[in-house]
Amino acid sequence: MSKLSLSSLDKSKLEGKKVLVRVDFNVPLNDDGQITDDTRIRAAIPTIKYLINNSAKVILAAHFGRPKGKVNERMRLTPIAARLSEILGKKVNLTESCIGEEALEKSNNLNNGDVLLLENVRFYEEEEKNDLNFAKNLAAHADMYVNDAFGAAHRAHASTQGVTKFLEPSVAGFLLEKELKYLQGAIDAPNRPLAAIVGGSKVSSKIGVLDSLLDKCDKIIIGGGMIFTFYKARGLDVGKSLVEEDKLELARNLEEKAKTKGVELLLPSDVVLANEFSPTAESKVSQIDSISGDWMGLDIGPQSIKVFQNALAECKTIIWNGPMGVFEFDKFAEGTNSIATTLADLSSFSEVCTIIGGGDSVAAVEKAGLAEKMSHISTGGGASLELLEGKNLPGVAALNEN
């Protein structure tokens, strides 16, 4: 990686220093305000522990939810500070605001190895506007900056980009470094054949990724609701399945581009249909050319699963972004679960590099209990997509060069 990393800073450079660390603690909470999945908090632990062990004073900046620039009591970081304290086995104090006298007093009074969490940076509208004055006030807490928030690295915000103008050095944390190594590596210098599995309900949200992957992949497998836009573009009847009518031409162009580039583009040959969008719907398997009027496709079929598994078995690097069907309904989760199991097996027994690129695929892999078996699980939804699209991430671009 061409960016300066935290690993290049040892105790002599960190001891007694106040280090502002941007983390991604945007975790899901239930109605009682309890954290239901602490993956993102755990992902930042190696960076935080490294700083503690090297006697730095750790000041964490994070956002939570979308408070739209106002204080929202339900979006305070209180449960996150509590969970982080449990994981670290030490008290993590929370400020009342991320900037201002109270927060500065707390950061100035830290001892070596202490950890302080600044209250939600998005309580200020200046955060998302990348306001330089606000960034300067955030930077006033610290001597140097670490960005470990891959999930927010595609945003040019005050806490991801603006602060780097005031803090030197500004370096990548261990999580950010690992994300770039796997995702950038898979795109720039993969072990081939390279396959991408792209799922999800809408072509529109994956256009950039599909277009970019066609320049880089040997095979692309498409699943999820977006397949019906491709079928409709081919002139097939798709019943009541989800279709983006304004993207038919685009679907045709993508298939055409794949042919021109010699990329093997695989779409399902059979699907699981439902008579309504419900976990208890009646279901049946159908070939794609015989989908009947009142039915809708909610998963890929058994024949397609086998074809996809055989295609993936020939690959050395696989990137997966987006589910194969409505995996939230058990009846329509078979396609997604089969792909997850296939990747876990290829990773474990055939040394295939498997990268789960953010969003719903991660949820599916976690739900199946297979996360540990994958080479890399990305913590960033939008950031993963933008990186796979070949875009520059502002939060990464702003860091010091190695």
Swiss-Prot record:
The protein, known as: Phosphoglycerate kinase
Residue numbers binding ATP: 206, 297, 328, 358-361
UniProt key word Nucleotide-binding: yes
InterPro entries: Phosphoglycerate_kinase, Phosphoglycerate_kinase_CS, Phosphoglycerate_kinase_N, Phosphoglycerate_kinase_sf
Keyword annotations from UniProtKB, A to Z: ATP-binding, Cytoplasm, Glycolysis, Kinase, Nucleotide-binding, Transferase
GO MF term set: ADP binding; ATP binding; phosphoglycerate kinase activity
HAMAP family (UniProt xref): Phosphoglyc_kinase
Its EC number(s): 2.7.2.3
Enzyme class: transferase
Pathway(s): Carbohydrate degradation; glycolysis; pyruvate from D-glyceraldehyde 3-phosphate: step 2/5
One term under GO cellular component: cytosol
Pfam hit, one: PGK
GO biological process, one term: gluconeogenesis
Subunit structure: Monomer.
Compartments where found: Cytoplasm
Catalyzed reactions per annotation: (2R)-3-phosphoglycerate + ATP = (2R)-3-phospho-glyceroyl phosphate + ADP
Family note: Belongs to the phosphoglycerate kinase family.
Residues annotated as binding substrate: 24-26, 40, 63-66, 122, 155
